A protein has these predicted regions:
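Alpha-helical transmembrane segments of multi-pass membrane proteins
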Residues: 3, 8-9, 50, 54, ...
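Hydrophobic alpha-helical transmembrane segments
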Residues: 69-76, 102-152, 202-204
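Interhelical loop/hinge segments that connect adjacent transmembrane helices in multipass membrane
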Residues: 143-188
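Membrane-water interface segments that mark the loop-to-transmembrane alpha-helix transition
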Residues: 2, 7-57, 70-73
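Helix-terminus/linker motif at the lipid-water interface of multi-pass membrane proteins
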Residues: 1, 60-62, 118-122, 184-204
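Membrane-interface junctions at transmembrane-helix termini in multi-pass inner-membrane proteins
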Residues: 20-29, 80-107, 117-118, 122
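Small-residue-rich midsections of specific transmembrane alpha-helices
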Residues: 1-25, 41, 79-87, 139-142, ...
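Interfacial/gating helices of multi-pass transporter permease domains
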Residues: 1-10, 69-70, 130, 164-172, ...
Length: 204
């Protein structure tokens, strides 16, 4: 259930501006689109945190799974990591750093695997969720380090420039955002409906 919720909303975590990162003529605009994506990812995570704080109990009741309530609070962390990583990954692809992008995935699975084994051996609850978060943030930190080596942070953070770019590429959140959310919801909502109609053990 947790991963279904995260997967549904992660496609719009950064407003789909991450898809525009490869398009600008200048590297400066490309980097500022990454900054813009990070801002949107933060907003998405913050809004989801407020919703979970206010309605976490109602959400878990709706999903017919009271045990998930304690883990819902981690959803903002997952959404933020996905949104930010997608932006940095597109920038690395723009730089033709394909090996770096592939290495990040390997690093994610490695950290995630070690963490999963640890939680499995110690019989601690929520191992899959925590391991997924550890893997994602490990991948994100490595991607940021790789971007730093390629001069990413030489470009200053500018609200004015990001506002200009947000308007220039507004079709991405307006068009791709809604369609991506609809497609993602179509793929994952059946699992949520099964949980509502039956029980979490049925869903797995």
């Amino acid at each position: 259930l947790y991963f279904s919720i995260v997967s549904t909303f992660s496609v719009i975590a950064s407003g789909r501006y991450e898809m525009a990162v490869v398009l600008p003529k200048t590297n400066e605009d490309s980097i500022r689109l990454v900054y813009l994506s990070v801002v949107f990812a933060f907003i998405t995570a913050f809004v989801s945190l407020i919703v979970i704080i206010l309605f976490g109990s109602e959400i878990s009741d709706l999903l017919n799974n009271t045990r998930i309530q304690d883990w819902l609070i981690l959803i903002p962390l997952s959404l933020f990591s996905v949104g930010v990583y997608q932006a940095f990954n597109f920038w690395l692809i723009r730089q033709k750093a394909f090996m770096a992008s592939s290495f990040n995935k390997v690093a994610q699975r490695s950290f995630e695997g070690v963490s999963t084994i640890y939680y499995g051996l110690t019989n601690k609850g929520g191992g899959l969720i925590i391991s997924d978060i550890i893997g994602r943030y490990s991948m994100l930190l490595i991607a940021i380090y790789q971007a730093r080596k390629r001069g990413f942070f030489h470009v200053s953070f500018s609200w004015l420039e990001m506002k200009r770019l947000a308007k220039l590429y507004k079709s991405f959140p307006l068009n791709f955002g809604l369609s991506s959310l609809a497609n993602s919801a179509g793929a994952h909502l059946p699992l949520l409906f099964i949980s509502i109609a039956f029980h979490s053990l049925t869903v797995g």
